[in-house]
Regions:
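Juxta-kinase regulatory segment immediately upstream of eukaryotic protein kinase catalytic domains
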Residues: 1-54, 248-252
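ATP-binding glycine-rich loop module of kinase domains
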Residues: 39-91
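Active-site beta-strand termini and strand-to-loop segments that position acidic
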Residues: 67-71, 120, 176-178
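A conserved alpha-helical element in kinase catalytic cores
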Residues: 78-112, 145, 206
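Conserved structural core of kinase catalytic domains
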Residues: 104-148
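Protein kinase catalytic-loop region centered on the HRD/HxD motif
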Residues: 152-163
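Hydrophobic residue at the +6 position relative to the catalytic HRD Asp in the kinase catalytic loop
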Residues: 170-176
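C-lobe/activation-segment region of protein kinase-like
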Residues: 177-258
């Protein structure tokens, strides 16, 4: 079920996605107007998640993500839930703009009160990507390069003063595309008001604890835990490039020509 033009989105099964979880006719009309303002011509209901009988790309506490089509092509559209803990998508849009300014995250294409339109990223979540390539001959090199890319992006977010907020548990927040480029997603809880700790948070997820750290250590070897903890504490006190390079070295992510 794909490429549904805006004129057909008033059908109940689609309307209940656009106004999830509480459908109201007036709210649907408002949101369809917002879609037109963003230049959206149609939505495409595909993905691994389901709401009723309709497939979607993602479902979270703040919004539902679906594929959208504009005159410029395919995009990702995040639709604010009617029961979300916020009244507008403005904050997330502003946080994504800051991330974009340091070449992190999908490109922001536009937003309204209830909608966030972004560049569509075709790829796999990091854990699934690693499991897919794990038996390939160049798996070690590819995994190391992607991990280095992720840490460099987190470093740029730290320098920008933007804390993502959810990278210590990030299985759903990093996608790897077909060109082995990593993309950090979901800036809904990001903030410039708290201390940015993206490098330390992502290192906990990738190298220090949990299934992801176990998966990675089985491919590239285990980072020295005590040494890495000390280096992360040092970086937290003084987030210099020199201290960051020491973290890369401890995680076996240097000498990759990235």
């Amino acid at each position: 079920m794909c490429m549904i033009p805006l004129s057909k989105l008033s059908e109940e099964k689609y309307a209940r996605i656009i106004c999830y979880p509480k459908y109201e006719r007036e709210e649907l009309t408002k949101r369809l107007c917002e879609m037109r303002r963003l230049g959206i011509k149609a939505l495409c209901f595909v993905g691994d998640k389901k709401i009723g009988e309709v497939s979607v790309l993602g479902k979270g506490y703040v919004g539902i993500v679906v594929s959208a089509y504009t005159e410029k092509g395919k995009a990702a559209l995040k639709i604010r839930r009617t029961d979300a803990d916020r009244k507008t998508m403005k904050h997330e849009a502003e946080m994504l703009q800051i991330a974009n300014s340091v070449n992190v995250g999908p490109r922001l294409l536009g937003f309204t009160q209830d909608l966030l339109l972004m560049e569509f990223i075709e790829g796999l979540l990091l854990p699934a990507w690693i499991k897919k390539i794990i038996e390939e001959r160049d798996a070690v090199k590819r995994v190391r390069r992607v991990l280095r890319d992720i840490l460099e992006q987190c470093r740029r977010l730290d320098e920008a003063g933007l804390d993502h907020g959810e990278l210590s548990k990030a299985p759903k927040h990093v996608i790897v595309d077909r060109g082995d480029k990593a993309w950090i997603l979901d800036f809904e809880t990001a903030s410039t008001m708290r201390r940015a700790s993206n490098v330390t948070s992502i290192c906990q997820f990738l190298f220090l604890k949990g299934r992801m750290a176990e998966l990675i250590s089985g491919i590239i070897g285990q980072a020295p835990q005590d040494d890495l903890l000390l280096l992360l504490k040092k970086y937290k006190r003084s987030p210099t490039r020199e201290n960051f390079e020491k973290i890369l070295e401890a995680c076996a992510l240097t000498g990759l020509n990235c």
